[in-house]
Design a protein with these regions (language model features):
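Conserved alpha/beta-hydrolase catalytic His-Asp/Glu region
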Residues: 150-206
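Conserved loop-alpha-helix segment in the C-terminal half of the alpha/beta-hydrolase fold
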Residues: 220-256
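Catalytic histidine-centered segment of alpha/beta-hydrolase-like enzymes
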Residues: 253-269
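Flexible "cap/lid" loop of the alpha/beta hydrolase fold
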Residues: 107-108, 114-153, 159, 235
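Alpha/beta-hydrolase active-site loop signature
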Residues: 27, 54-58, 127, 257-260
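The conserved beta1-alpha1 loop
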Residues: 21-27, 95, 227
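Active-site loop/oxyanion-hole signature of alpha/beta-hydrolase fold enzymes
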Residues: 2-10, 41-93, 97, 101, ...
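Serine-hydrolase catalytic-loop signature spanning alpha/beta hydrolases and amidase-signature enzymes
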Residues: 27-35, 49
Length: 278
C-alpha cells in the first residue's frame, strides 16, 4: 500500500492534545509550511501540526488513479490514525489547491472516527468552480511547461536553466528544483513529480463546487476564508457569499498576494492564533 508522507511538528517536550493539519498548494510540499508550523506550536504547545505531502507531491509518490480532490482527501483520512497518537484533528489549514482539499477533508472527517473539525482555515482558495482558472494562470502555465521537460538533466543547475530560459523567474525555478532527484544508478537527474497526473488533479480542482459544505457545515465547524488583497483567486462575490454564511468569517490581508504565508506571515499567524483561541 502506498503511504502518504505526514511530518508531525510539536513544541519542545510537548505532547499535543489536538492537531492542526497543513495542506500545501499544487507543486508544493508540506515543508513549505514548516517554519509557520514551528512558530504556531511554539505559541500554542497544546497543539501539534501535521505537514502533509499531498498525493503525487513531495515524498507521497506512486498513488494510483483516480487523481481527484475526493481521493486526495481520502488519502489523508486514511493516514491520520497512524500519526496522531490518538489525539483528534481539530483544525485544518489549506492554501490554494490545499484549501479546497481542506474543505473536502472536513466533509470526510465528519463521517470518520475523528469526527467533525472545530475550525477550517482556507487561505486564498475559492470553494466554488473556476473554469477560467482565474488567479491561477501562472501556476497553470508552469504545469503546462513542466509537461515538456526532458526526461533527464546532467544536474539541478541544468534544470533551473531550462525553466528560466522559458520565462520562469529564478525563485520559482529554485523552488521547483526541490523536486529534482538523482536517477538511480546514474549520474543524471530527473524531475520526480508525475506532472500529467498533477494536471488531472488540477482539472478536478477547478470544476468542483464545495460551497455546499460551508453552507451546511458538519457539526459546529467554523470556517475562515482568508484572501490575499492583491490576489485574483477570490472575487468580491466570493467574499460576499462567505460573509452571508453563518459560522464563516472572511478576512482580507491587504499587503499580500496569493502566497499569503510568504507575503504576510505575521499577519496570517495572528489570524490563525485568533481563530484557534488566542
Amino acid at each position: 500500500m502506498t503511504a502518504l508522507a505526514v511530518a508531525p511538528v510539536t513544541a519542545k517536550d510537548a505532547t499535543p492534545s489536538k492537531w492542526l493539519v497543513f495542506l500545501h498548494g499544487i507543486l508544493g510540499s508540506g515543508a513549505n509550511w514548516r517554519t509557520f508550523a514551528r512558530q504556531f506550536v511554539a505559541a500554542k504547545p497544546e497543539w501539534g501540526a501535521l505537514l502533509v505531502d499531498l498525493r503525487l507531491h513531495g515524498d507521497s509518490q506512486g498513488f494510483a488513479p483516480p487523481h481527484t480532490l475526493e481521493a486526495v482527501a481520502r488519502d489523508i483520512v486514511e493516514a491520520l490514525p497512524t500519526v496522531t497518537g490518538g489525539a483528534p484533528v481539530r483544525a485544518v489549514l489549506g492554501h490554494s489547491f490545499g484549501g479546497k482539499v481542506g474543505i473536502e477533508l472536513a466533509r470526510q472527517l465528519a463521517a470518520s472516527p475523528n469526527g467533525p473539525l472545530d475550525q477550517l482555515i482556507v487561505v486564498d482558495s475559492t470553494p466554488g468552480p473556476r473554469p477560467d482558472h482565474r488567479g491561477s494562470s501562472n501556476v497553470r502555465h508552469i504545469v503546462e511547461l513542466l509537461m515538456q521537460l526532458p526526461p533527464e538533466f546532467p544536474d539541478r543547475t541544468a534544470f533551473t536553466a531550462w525553466v528560466e530560459e522559458r520565462g520562469v523567474n529564478r525563485p520559482i525555478a529554485m523552488w521547483l528544483a526541490m523536486n529534482v532527484r538523482p536517477v538511480p544508478n546514474t549520474t543524471r537527474f530527473e524531475f520526480r513529480l508525475d506532472v500529467p497526473s498533477i494536471r488531472t488533479m488540477m482539472d478536478d480542482y477547478f470544476v468542483q463546487d464545495l460551497w455546499p459544505v460551508l453552507e451546511n457545515p458538519p457539526g459546529h465547524m467554523a470556517t475562515h476564508l482568508i484572501a490575499g488583497g492583491s490576489s485574483e483567486v477570490l472575487e468580491a462575490a466570493d467574499l460576499e457569499r462567505g460573509r452571508t454564511l453563518a459560522g464563516t468569517t472572511v478576512d482580507v490581508v491587504p499587503n499580500a498576494g496569493h502566497w499569503v504565508h510568504v507575503d504576510a506571515p505575521d499577519t496570517l499567524r495572528e489570524l490563525v492564533l485568533g481563530y484557534l483561541g488566542g
